[in-house]
Structures are given as C-alpha cells and as structure tokens.
C-alpha cells in the first residue's frame, strides 16, 4: 500500500529535519553540527534569510546553549524558530499594509 503524500507543512518539517542530518556529523559527532558544518548549512540553505546576521561565529555561539561548539538538533531548532518569527513579522506587516 502506497503512503499518502505529505501535506505542505509535513514536507516542510521533514525538510528541516533532513537538512540538519545532511550536514550534521560530516566532521564531528553524528547528530550535531560543528562550526564549519553550521556555516556550510547556512550559506547553502539559508542565504537569503541569514544574509544580515553578521558573524556566523557569533550566531553559532548564541545558539549553542551548552557551549560545546556544536549544535544539537534542539539548538538548531532555535534558529528555525527565530527565522520563523522574523517571517511572521514580515507577513504581519504585509497584512497591515493592505
């Protein structure tokens, strides 16, 4: 029996998770992003949303709650949450202008 296709939201969530694991563990521990893996993920997958972030090293430090120089999925998820909040703000401004 074929699985039903994912909804747009389900596919988006799967993409967020898959992207993390595509980049995580290439250098350091599997299941976490090293500094270089984080930079590679951001520059390849988030170039438009994080173009004004400033130093990626500083952004990494702000997300790295346990300060182990790696991002676990929960720390990476904080970045996704921050980006979603910014997009929501932009959408709210667009709605107000209408």
Curated annotation (Swiss-Prot):
GO cellular component terms attached to this protein's record: cytosol; extracellular space; nucleolus; nucleoplasm; perinuclear region of cytoplasm; plasma membrane
Primary location class: cytoplasm
Pfam families, per database record: S_100
Compartments (UniProt record): Cytoplasm; Secreted
CDD domains recorded: S-100A13 (cd05022)
UniProt keyword Secreted, yes or no: yes
Keywords: Calcium, Copper, Cytoplasm, Lipid-binding, Metal-binding, Phosphoprotein, Protein transport, Repeat, Secreted, Transport
Chain sites annotated for binding Ca(2+) 1: 32, 37
Molecular function via GO: calcium ion binding; calcium-dependent protein binding; copper ion binding; fibroblast growth factor binding; lipid binding; protein homodimerization activity; RAGE receptor binding; zinc ion binding
Single Gene Ontology BP annotation: positive regulation of canonical NF-kappaB signal transduction
Subunit architecture: Homodimer. Part of a copper-dependent multiprotein complex containing S100A13, FGF1 and SYT1. Interacts with FGF1 and SYT1. Interacts with IL1A.
Function: Plays a role in the export of proteins that lack a signal peptide and are secreted by an alternative pathway. Binds two calcium ions per subunit. Binds one copper ion. Binding of one copper ion does not interfere with calcium binding. Required for the copper-dependent stress-induced export of IL1A and FGF1. The calcium-free protein binds to lipid vesicles containing phosphatidylserine, but not to vesicles containing phosphatidylcholine.
Protein name stated in the entry: Protein S100-A13
């Amino acid at each position: 029996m074929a699985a039903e296709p994912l909804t747009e939201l389900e596919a988006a969530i799967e993409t967020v998770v898959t992207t993390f694991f595509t980049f995580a563990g290439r250098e350091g521990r599997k299941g976490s992003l090293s500094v270089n893996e984080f930079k590679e993920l951001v520059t390849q997958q988030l170039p438009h949303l994080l173009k004004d972030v400033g130093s990626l090293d500083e952004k990494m430090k702000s997300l790295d709650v346990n300060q182990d120089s790696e991002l676990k999925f929960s720390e990476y998820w904080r970045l996704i949450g921050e980006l979603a909040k910014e997009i929501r703000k932009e959408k709210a401004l667009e709605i107000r202008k209408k």
